[in-house]
């Protein structure tokens, strides 16, 4: 049997692609080395932010706006919504390059972003403390996503639509042959007209030439009371310290507030090097500088987890076909800010499988930029 599309890596992007391609009428096989959603990639830990006025560059805004439409649609398939519109407050010094990019993206795309000075920030959210030279850019329409619920939903919907799924089955090789691609697994060989490689952190085990560096990261949950909950209108947030360190976090749920540091981490070369939380000395204290200065009412660390970023050299995505193989699409290098785009990236992969041109300018994400 020859599939229309085989997906290698069925985490965030792969799960979305499996659903959207199957829904479009294609014969699809989803493969994953584990049973998604799982703890071995970048999608676990309950929640991920979604921001529209994008501080990483306005080239992402059309993608994230389409992603939001797809998240809203996905939320209709569950009693518990995948997307929670908590609002996101972006905090930092008034001369922050990241905040300047947020403001520019908002202006270019007429997005609702409210600028607050330090006094206004503390007045609205007394739990937050910032220096006098800080500003906040508040995105009322943004919020957070329930990442594992999203993947569970896509996988369920894809299966119900007739998608074949092969999990707990690593891929060992890919062969390009004539008019198709053969994927070699522990379970046998499978062929397709086209392949999506969305293998996340460990994509280099299949494609060692890709410029992707795995980085071990951690996030943790800290003791928090009802003041920090979404019921009290406490928002999700990003925060930049005066030294440039970047943090992100979420409203407290069940008296626990989740926070992580975006920059930093440990470069690794294999899965065994991704040590569990607390096995690196700095894990438990990584968020302390932010919590002490910005959220001083937060209590002790309750628990945490480690994950991985698949970083590209410029921390922009890689969305491109393999050189010389137009039937093989690679989506990788999401660099720790990719989950919010998983829905639209899955749709892009489904369009690729159908032979449709991309609905977006993907030039900034081509592999050729690294030559």
Curated annotation (Swiss-Prot):
Q: Name one GO cellular component term.
A: cytosol
Q: How does it assemble?
A: Monomer.
Name the record gives this protein: N-methyl-L-tryptophan oxidase
Q: Which family does it belong to?
A: Belongs to the MSOX/MTOX family. MTOX subfamily.
What EC class does the entry list? oxidoreductase
Q: Which NCBIfam families match?
A: PRK11259.1
Q: Which UniProt keywords are given for this protein, alphabetically ordered?
A: FAD, Flavoprotein, Oxidoreductase
Entry EC no(s): 1.5.3.-
Provide the GO MF annotations for this entry: flavin adenine dinucleotide binding; N-methyl-L-amino-acid oxidase activity; sarcosine oxidase activity
């Amino acid at each position: 049997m020859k599939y229309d599309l085989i997906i290698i890596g069925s985490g965030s992007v792969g799960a979305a692609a499996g659903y959207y391609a199957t829904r479009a009428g294609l014969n699809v096989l989803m493969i994953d080395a584990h049973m998604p959603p799982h703890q071995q990639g970048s999608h676990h830990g309950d929640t991920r932010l979604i921001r529209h006025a994008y501080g990483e560059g306005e080239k992402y805004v059309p993608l994230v706006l389409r992603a939001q439409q797809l998240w809203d649609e996905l939320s209709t398939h569950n009693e518990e919504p995948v997307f929670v519109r908590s609002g996101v407050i972006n905090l930092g010094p008034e001369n922050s390059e990241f905040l300047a990019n947020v403001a520019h993206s908002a202006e270019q795309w007429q997005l609702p972003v409210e600028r607050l000075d330090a006094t206004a920030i503390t007045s609205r959210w007394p739990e937050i403390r910032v220096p006098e030279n800080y500003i906040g850019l508040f995105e009322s329409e943004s919020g957070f996503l329930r990442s594992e619920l999203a993947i569970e939903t896509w996988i369920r919907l894809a299966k119900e639509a007739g998608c074949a799924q092969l999990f707990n089955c690593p891929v060992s090789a890919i062969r390009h042959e004539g008019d198709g691609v053969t994927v070699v697994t522990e379970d046998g060989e499978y062929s397709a007209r086209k392949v999506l490689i969305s293998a996340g952190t460990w994509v280099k085990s299949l494609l060692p030439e890709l410029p992707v560096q795995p980085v071990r990261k951690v996030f943790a949950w800290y003791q928090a009371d009802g003041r920090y909950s979404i019921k009290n209108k406490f928002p999700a947030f990003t925060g930049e310290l005066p030294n440039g360190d970047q943090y992100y976090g979420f409203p407290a749920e069940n008296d626990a507030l989740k926070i992580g540091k975006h920059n930093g981490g440990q470069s690794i070369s294999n899965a065994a090097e991704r040590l569990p939380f607390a096995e690196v000395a700095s894990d438990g204290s990584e968020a302390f500088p932010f919590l002490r200065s910005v959220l001083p009412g937060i209590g002790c660390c309750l628990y945490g987890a480690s994950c991985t970023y698949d970083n590209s050299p410029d921390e922009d995505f890689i969305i491109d076909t393999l050189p010389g193989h137009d039937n093989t699409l690679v989506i990788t290098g999401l660099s720790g800010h990719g989950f919010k785009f998983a829905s639209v990236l899955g749709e892009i992969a489904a369009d690729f499988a159908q032979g449709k041109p991309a609905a977006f300018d993907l030039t900034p994400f081509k592999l050729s930029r690294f030559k």
